[in-house]
């Protein structure tokens, strides 16, 4: 039996074999990433992409979110749709107006990851959000507590708390009525 391989097919196989260890190393890095690294990666992605609260944008961030938080965020869109169907003649502002990941309607200009506290399968990472200031006064600041859990061997974001005003993303998403 005589097999014939083209240079192109041999080159393709060689490239795939060469990339295999890189893919494996990346997968290991993802599962062993620290809570701080996960939060840094999430907000770096978030700040460099569209921050609007939309189904598509939530799906783009799913790799960083716990199944619970992802489910609650997706459910929020269903709740909004149900409310709109039940009140077809009513004009309303959606409950989740703005960006739930920064707890703001006006997007911050930068962020800083701070102190991390790890306890078994849970972690808390402090994040400082910054808005560019006008004049000498400087900008606004907001302190967040990003709560993570270890799921499937990797750290994922499970809740976001605004330390300045006590806002709790998961509690807001679990509220009984769509609009107060």
PLM region spans:
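Surface-exposed patches in mature extracellular/periplasmic domains of secreted proteins
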Residues: 49-61
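N-terminal export leaders
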Residues: 6-11, 15
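Low-complexity, intrinsically disordered terminal/linker segments enriched in charged
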Residues: 120-145, 150-152, 156-180
């Amino acid at each position: 039996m005589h097999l014939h391989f083209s240079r192109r097919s041999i080159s393709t196989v060689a490239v795939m074999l060469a990339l295999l260890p890189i893919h494996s190393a990346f997968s290991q890095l993802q599962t062993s990433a620290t809570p701080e690294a996960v939060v840094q990666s999430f907000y770096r992605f978030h700040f460099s992409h569209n921050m609007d609260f939309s189904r598509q944008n939530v799906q783009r961030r799913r790799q960083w979110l716990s199944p619970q938080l992802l489910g609650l965020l997706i459910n929020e869109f269903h709740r909004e749709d149900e409310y709109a169907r039940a009140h077809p003649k009513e004009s309303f502002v959606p409950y989740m107006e703005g960006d739930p990941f920064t707890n703001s309607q006006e997007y911050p200009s930068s962020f800083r990851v701070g102190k991390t506290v790890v306890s078994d399968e849970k972690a808390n990472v402090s994040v400082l959000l910054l808005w560019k200031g006008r004049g000498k006064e400087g900008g606004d600041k907001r302190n967040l507590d990003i709560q993570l859990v270890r799921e499937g061997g990797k750290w994922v974001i499970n809740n976001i708390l605004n330390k300045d005003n006590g806002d709790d993303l998961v509690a807001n998403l679990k509220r009984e009525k769509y609009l107060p």
